[in-house]
């Protein structure tokens, strides 16, 4: 698969098989985060890998899915939940914490996962205080986001945006349709 096809299919996935992500793949996802580019090589990010079924189950009610969809459509059913989470933290005791570095690490993790057919969902709609307590995070660690991982049970397609509507939706097969703006709208000029 060429890089553009890879990027078009490495979308957000929200329903998963109940099959564990192999330890070597989980480790590779974390290695991808570790080696991500970062400003001034500061390396301010820290992670918690949540993979035991008990802890994954405790995380599930603390994350919120698919804000554009009604819960009965967007919320994974008990047999569709992720099998692994990664909590992404910014260590504010280190200089230079920023969201750009966090975004680079998130992209590395989700790309590394997708190279093995593991889908992901980067989540910002989370119960930060409860997750920090559950994971024993304190001090200078700011919980930025959580990433859900698993083998997807649905597809996700890019579609042309209609009337400026950015809201994703489900088609008749319960696959996600994700509207994207046309190139003419996002490329301001070529000089």
Sequence positions of predicted segments:
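Acidic, surface-exposed loops and disordered segments
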Residues: 1-191
């Amino acid at each position: 698969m060429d890089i553009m096809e890879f990027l078009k299919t490495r979308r957000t996935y929200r329903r998963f098989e109940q099959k564990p992500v192999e330890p070597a793949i989980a480790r590779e996802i974390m290695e991808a985060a570790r080696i991500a580019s970062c400003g001034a090589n500061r390396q301010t990010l820290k992670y918690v890998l949540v993979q035991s079924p008990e802890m994954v189950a405790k995380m599930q009610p603390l994350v919120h899915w698919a804000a554009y969809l009604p819960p009965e459509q967007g919320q994974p059913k008990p047999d569709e939940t992720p099998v692994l989470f990664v909590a992404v933290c910014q260590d504010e005791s280190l200089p230079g914490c920023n969201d750009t570095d966090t975004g680079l690490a998130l992209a590395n993790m989700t790309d590394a996962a997708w190279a093995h057919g593991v889908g992901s969902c980067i989540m910002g709609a989370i119960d930060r205080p409860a997750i920090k307590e559950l994971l024993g995070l304190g001090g200078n660690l700011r919980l930025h986001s959580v990433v859900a991982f698993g083998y997807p049970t649905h597809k996700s397609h890019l579609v042309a945006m209609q009337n400026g509507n950015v809201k994703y939706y489900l088609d008749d097969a319960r696959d996600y349709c994700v509207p994207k703006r046309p190139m003419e709208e996002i490329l301001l000029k070529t000089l």
